[in-house]
């Protein structure tokens, strides 16, 4: 599938280049158009609504912000909930509350090629701001034989 994504990306860049020559856009319009193409391709990395363990509500079409919740019994797997790829930088604040009856659930955040996993504090809370710089950036919930509830919100940090 990586070869297919690369072929689609290259075709999109060629088509965009041809359109841009005819349109004579500003530099910002070129960046915005390229960012849109990169973002659309990156959506394949986000778990589809129908495949989610939990339930996600995005704010409009923005895949970086919204809310997510799940109530689980012995669940295993991973939900890639928020994020995408972009040439633009974003500062995202994630708030996660995990109430565990058994098993484990954690927040995993990918920023570019760096992947880190975060556990809750003694109150079951994770609250952290991330710099989502250009590239692929995703917030995920990882379930390991988890019984309990998860709530997460993602918003732009000030």
Spans of features found by a protein language model:
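Short, surface-exposed beta-strand/strand-loop-strand elements in extracellular ectodomains
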Residues: 101-118
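Short, solvent-exposed loop/turn segments in extracellular or other extracytoplasmic domains
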Residues: 77, 120-127
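Transition segment at domain starts
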Residues: 25-84
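Edge beta-strands of jelly-roll/beta-sandwich modules across compartments, strongly enriched
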Residues: 143-158
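Extracellular and analogous surface-interaction loops
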Residues: 74, 81-92, 129-134
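A short beta-strand element within beta-rich, extracytoplasmic domains
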Residues: 90-100
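Hydrophobic membrane-insertion alpha-helices, especially the h-region
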Residues: 6-20
């Amino acid at each position: 599938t990586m070869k297919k994504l690369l072929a689609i990306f290259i075709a999109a860049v060629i088509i965009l280049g041809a359109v841009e020559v005819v349109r004579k856009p500003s530099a910002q319009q070129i960046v915005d158009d390229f960012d849109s193409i990169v973002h659309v391709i990156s959506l394949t990395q986000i778990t589809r609504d129908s495949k989610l363990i939990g339930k996600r509500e995005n704010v409009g079409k923005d895949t970086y912000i919204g809310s997510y919740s799940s109530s689980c019994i012995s669940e295993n797997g991973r939900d890639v909930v928020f994020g995408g790829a972009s040439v633009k930088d974003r500062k995202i604040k994630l708030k996660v509350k995990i109430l565990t009856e058994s098993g484990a659930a954690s927040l995993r955040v990918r920023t570019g090629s760096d992947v880190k996993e975060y556990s809750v504090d003694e109150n079951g809370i994770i609250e952290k701001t991330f710099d989502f710089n250009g590239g692929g950036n995703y917030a995920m919930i990882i379930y390991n034989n988890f019984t309990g509830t998860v709530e997460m919100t993602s918003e732009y940090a000030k």
